[in-house]
Curated annotation (Swiss-Prot):
InterPro entries: AlgH-like
CC terms in the record's Gene Ontology section: cytosol
Protein name: UPF0301 protein CPS_1252
Record-linked Pfam families: DUF179 (PF02622)
Species for this entry: Colwellia psychrerythraea (strain 34H / ATCC BAA-681)
Record family assignment: Belongs to the UPF0301 (AlgH) family.
Top-rank taxon: Bacteria
Upper lineage: Bacteria, Pseudomonadati, Pseudomonadota, Gammaproteobacteria, Alteromonadales
Length: 210
């Protein structure tokens, strides 16, 4: 089987694990040692703003949350005011449960923007970063243009994902920026299946992967 990196993994009704019910998972890594991905449609009851309040900036780190004393909020420039609104809105997005493994660890899937301490290039359009510097930059002008934040990740051992695909537990489709960043969380599973031309009402256990 060819690598499923940069693919979306769509849970089928036949998948027996309730944790992954109607989930869409972005596959970050897939090789002979197994696979690793982030669920992109399983929100937890915490906003990004709430999460950032729990993170202490490193000594000398000047990128933090926007607050009433920020220079951004003091500007009368219309473009700056719009920027502050956009930043505020981005901080109100919900954090996602990326999977059942390492649920205290944060992962940021974002549009391509280098310069972080610990990043992996996933495609021309996407990167994943796990270092603290990007978390502290979220909510500032230094943040990537598009991003989602997850706690935890999903993992498969050698051959495990291949077996689950053969059992028709998953469908696959190439990653779509529209689904990742612009589609409401609750609609991502539906949009991903529609991309394959599948009618949700006719999904059954005898459908193989795409």
């Amino acid at each position: 089987m060819s690598s499923l990196e940069n693919q979306l993994l769509i849970a089928m009704p036949s998948l027996g694990d309730p944790y992954f019910n109607k989930t869409v998972t972005y596959i970050c890594e897939h090789n002979e040692d197994g696979a690793m991905g982030l669920i992109i449609n399983l929100p937890v009851n915490i906003t990004l703003a709430d999460l950032l309040k729990q993170i202490e900036p490193d000594e000398g780190d000047k990128t933090g949350n926007v607050n009433s004393n920020s220079e951004l909020t003091k500007s009368d420039d219309v473009n700056d005011i719009t920027l502050v609104t956009d930043i505020t809105n981005s901080l109100e997005q919900l954090v996602l449960a990326g999977g059942p493994i390492a649920q205290q660890r944060g992962f940021v899937l974002h549009s391509s923007q280098p310069g972080w301490s610990s990043s992996l290039v996933l495609s021309k359009e996407l990167m994943i970063t796990t270092s603290k510097d990007i978390l502290m930059a979220l909510g500032t002008q230094q943040a990537p243009e598009q991003f989602i934040v997850t706690l935890g990740y999903a993992g498969w051992g050698p051959g495990q994902l291949e077996q689950e695909l053969q059992a028709n537990s998953w469908l696959t489709t190439p990653a779509d920026i529209e689904i990742l960043f612009k589609t409401p969380i609750e609609q991502r599973w539906k949009k991903a299946t529609e991309k394959l031309g599948i009618d949700l009402a006719h999904l059954s256990t005898d459908i193989g992967h795409a």
